[in-house]
Structures are given as structure tokens and as C-alpha cells.
């Protein structure tokens, strides 16, 4: 299914037996509504309308999507603008081509009665996160936290339910549902409200972009069409996602969808004109500067090599 063309210059992308061009999308987690637009484009035939046969490969906590794309195991992947910039700084030849979320749904979840009322209050507490998370370093620096501890995330609410002082990293569209279903009263604090707000993006390899810009354009166009459709007509797509990931209930998927829609994570609500799929050079530069300040990017480079505005709705800005 995957040709070696993506690793070398000057060769054509091969068509499958059905006459469609096969490509793979590596997601960042197991099938869920946060991927709804991609499944919409696949199920409703929008990829096929563009001549593409798209395989959606589920991710998980230990999948390195940047590496998958760099070595040609996938042509496209989901990620975030901060991770793309860090990967490019580390020599990974990847390029972001469109945004799938204008706002980042990462948050901290706390019990309703927690004494932690703001990010400044995290001092003296432990926080369960994916160890090494850059946003956590940003919080420590911005709020001058001296005594906050990282503990490994378990990707479950079990520890949260047992410990009234527990604080954990979450997607605000996911874990609060499970905690409330189990009887907890919870609060959340969005990381994006601190000023650290990466896009969620689609990225590809620099080689694939250079060799197959027409395929990239088709994939972006069909994916954004799927996202527009999913935000209006989610039910049958959620039913299909539920078959792929039976751990998700109808109620949980509805909770996730409503969060994505009502909090404008996908389409954005920026008065300056943020819209589905778009990103701006100014915001990429701002994120790059934050990473430089945190010293997670050690050797400066032009952040413009990490993204392209070529495929964005109305050209981006």
C-alpha cells in the first residue's frame, strides 16, 4: 500500500487496483470524535471524490507520528504545531499543511473542591501528565512554579476517582465525561488560556510535499470538507467510530462532539477571522518564540520551514 516513492525524488505515486491513489493518515489516538472529520471524509466518499484511497491508522500513547511520516510509513499524520516545530528543530523533515483545531483542548482536570483555583496555585501539588510535556515547562516558567511535581499520566480516571487531590492532564472533550459518569464533580482549566495554544494540524513529509503537492491539496481539501460536514451531521459518523472503538458509548461521543462544536475548537471563534483549516504565520512565529524561550529548541531556524500556507482556505495569512 505504501510505495517507496515517498522516500526518493523523481518518481510517481502509484495508483491502486481501484484507480485511486493510496495514502495513509496516522492519527494521534484511538478512533474518537476528535478525529470525526477524517472519518466523515472517508465514509462519505470525499477522499474518493478526490481520487484518494485513504487508510486511517489509529494512534496511541506510544506512537511517534512524526517519525512515521519522516520515514514514509504514513503520508499524513495528526499532530500539534509545537511538536511539529520541535521535530523540525531536531532535524525531522516534516511540514504542517492545515489546521484541524484552532484551539487546543488540552486541560487540567481537578476535583470541584480542590484548593487549586488557578495555574499559580499548582505549587506544592503533583500533576499527572505525559512526562516531558512542553506546555508543563511553559506553566512552570510563566507562573514561577518552584514546587510542582510531574507524575506519569495513566490515560485513565481511576486514580482521579480515588484521590480527591489528584490533578491530571486531559482533553476537555473526553475525560471529564468519564469522571462525571463515575460520580465526581470536576473542574477543568484549559492550557490554551495561559497563552500556550498550539494548533492541532495535519502534517506530511517535506519530500512528499515536494513530489506530490497535488495529492496534498486533494487530501487537505477532502479532510476539511469532512470536518465541515461532521460539525453539522455527526451522528452516523459517531456510530461508525463507535464500531471501530467499542469502548466509546453514544453518550460519551455526543459529549465530545458538543465540546468540539460549542467551544469552537475546530472552526475557531477568533474575531480576526480564524476559520476551519487555517493557520497564520504570526501564530506559528509566536509558538516558535515560546519554544525558543523554553530552550526546547536549541538551534534557531526559520519557523516558516515547518509549515506552508499553500493549501489553506482563502490562502491563509
For each predicted feature, which ranges?
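Structural motif detector for alpha-helix initiation sites
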Residues: 118-119, 206, 303
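Pocket-lining segment of extracytoplasmic ligand-binding domains
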Residues: 82, 155-249
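Short, glycine-/small- and polar/acidic-enriched structural segments
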Residues: 16-170, 189-190
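Sec/Tat-exported extracytoplasmic proteins
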Residues: 42-45, 50-51, 73, 78-81, ...
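Short, low-complexity disordered leader/linker segments with a strong preference
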Residues: 1-21, 316-317
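Stable alpha-helical elements in mature extracytoplasmic
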Residues: 34, 43, 62-65, 80-83, ...
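Conserved C-terminal helix/tail region of periplasmic/extracytoplasmic solute-binding proteins
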Residues: 282-317
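Secondary-structure end/capping motifs
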Residues: 211-296
Amino acid at each position: 500500500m505504501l510505495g517507496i516513492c515517498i522516500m526518493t525524488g523523481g518518481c510517481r505515486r502509484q495508483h491502486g487496483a481501484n484507480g485511486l491513489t493510496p495514502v495513509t493518515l496516522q492519527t494521534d489516538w484511538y478512533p474518537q470524535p476528535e478525529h470525526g472529520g477524517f472519518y466523515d471524509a472517508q465514509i462519505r466518499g470525499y477522499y474518493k471524490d478526490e481520487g484518494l484511497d485513504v487508510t486511517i491508522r489509529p494512534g496511541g500513547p506510544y506512537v511517534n507520528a512524526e517519525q512515521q511520516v519522516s520515514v514514509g510509513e504514513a503520508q499524513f499524520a495528526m499532530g500539534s504545531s509545537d511538536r511539529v516545530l520541535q521535530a523540525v528543530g531536531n532535524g525531522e523533515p516534516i511540514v504542517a499543511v492545515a489546521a484541524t483545531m484552532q484551539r487546543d483542548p488540552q486541560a487540567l482536570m481537578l476535583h470541584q473542591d480542590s484548593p487549586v483555583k488557578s495555574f499559580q496555585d499548582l505549587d506544592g501539588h503533583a500533576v499527572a501528565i505525559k512526562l516531558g510535556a512542553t506546555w508543563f515547562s511553559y506553566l512552570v516558567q510563566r507562573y514561577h512554579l518552584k514546587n510542582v511535581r510531574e507524575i506519569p499520566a495513566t490515560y485513565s480516571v481511576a486514580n482521579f476517582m480515588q484521590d480527591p487531590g489528584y490533578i491530571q492532564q486531559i482533553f476537555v472533550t473526553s475525560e471529564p465525561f468519564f469522571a462525571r459518569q463515575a460520580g465526581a464533580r470536576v473542574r477543568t482549566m484549559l492550557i490554551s488560556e495561559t497563552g500556550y495554544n498550539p494548533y492541532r494540524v495535519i502534517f506530511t513529509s517535506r519530500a512528499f510535499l515536494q513530489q506530490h503537492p497535488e495529492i496534498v491539496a486533494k487530501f487537505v481539501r477532502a479532510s476539511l470538507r469532512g470536518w465541515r460536514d461532521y460539525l453539522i451531521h455527526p451522528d452516523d459518523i459517531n456510530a461508525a467510530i463507535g464500531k471501530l472503538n467499542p469502548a466509546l458509548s453514544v453518550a460519551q461521543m455526543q459529549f465530545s462532539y458538543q465540546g468540539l462544536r460549542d467551544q469552537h475548537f475546530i472552526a475557531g471563534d477568533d474575531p480576526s477571522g480564524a476559520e476551519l483549516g487555517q493557520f497564520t504565520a504570526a501564530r506559528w512565529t509566536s509558538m516558535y518564540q515560546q519554544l525558543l524561550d523554553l530552550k526546547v529548541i536549541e538551534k534557531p531556524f526559520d519557523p516558516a520551514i515547518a509549515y506552508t500556507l499553500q493549501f489553506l482556505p482563502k490562502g491563509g495569512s
